[in-house]
Amino acid sequence: MSSSQNNNSSWIDWFLGIKGNQFLCRVPTDYVQDTFNQMGLEYFSEILDVILKPVIDSSSGLLYGDEKKWYGMIHARYIRSERGLIAMHRKYLRGDFGSCPNISCDRQNTLPVGLSAVWGKSTVKIHCPRCKSNFHPKSDTQLDGAMFGPSFPDIFFSMLPNLTSPLDDPRT
């Protein structure tokens, strides 16, 4: 990305535009600013200022390195909210997360899942609702699994149960 592009977009725009970050959805500014949603997260006001700044200027030296983690943890909370589930639902229906590599799943759309809610434990995986298996995504993503957490697919499908189609039972 050229420096002129960096200078004309917000940190969130810049971050979401990085190759490999396509699993993430945009967390609205009002959600990020709500102190209730920040509860329990370690952060510095400078990081929040960088994330919410309408224009990013990476040459100013105001990037601290913790923005990715902080945005990721807010993202994990947001995708469990009604608005977040709607945003992830759109991405799921478009197939943004990829499809199950298991042939018997017939290219079932998948969801991102973290194997841990603790930052730095593992990268994101994809979860198939048909075979209930987790796989490494085909996309070139190195997102931390904590940005989604281990319970996201369960929450998603409990709120939208008609989206799953179980594998055909060969005994019937």
Curated annotation (Swiss-Prot):
One of its GO terms (cellular component) is protein kinase CK2 complex. PROSITE patterns: CK2_BETA (PS01101). Induction: In wild-type flies, it is strongly down-regulated by double-stranded RNA (dsRNA) interference mediated by Su(Ste) transcripts. In males lacking the Y chromosome, the absence of Su(Ste) locus, relieves such down-regulation, explaining why it is strongly expressed. GO terms for molecular function: protein kinase regulator activity. InterPro entries: Casein_kin_II_reg-sub_N (IPR016149), Casein_kinase_II_beta-like (IPR035991), Casein_kinase_II_reg-sub (IPR000704). Probably not expressed in wild-type flies. In males lacking the Y chromosome, it is testis-specific and constitutes the main component of star-shaped crystals. Signal peptide: none annotated. Belongs to the casein kinase 2 subunit beta family. Interacts in vitro with the casein kinase 2 alpha subunit (CkII-alpha). The relevance of such interaction is however unclear in vivo. There are multiple copies of the stellate gene in fruit fly, encoding proteins that are extremely similar, which makes their individual characterization difficult. Thus, most experiments probably do not discriminate between the different members. Unknown. In males lacking the Y chromosome, its strong overexpression leads to the appearance of proteinaceous star-shaped crystals in the primary spermatocytes causing meiotic drive, possibly by interfering with normal casein kinase 2 activity. This is Stellate protein CG33236/CG33240/CG33244/CG33245. It comes from Drosophila melanogaster.
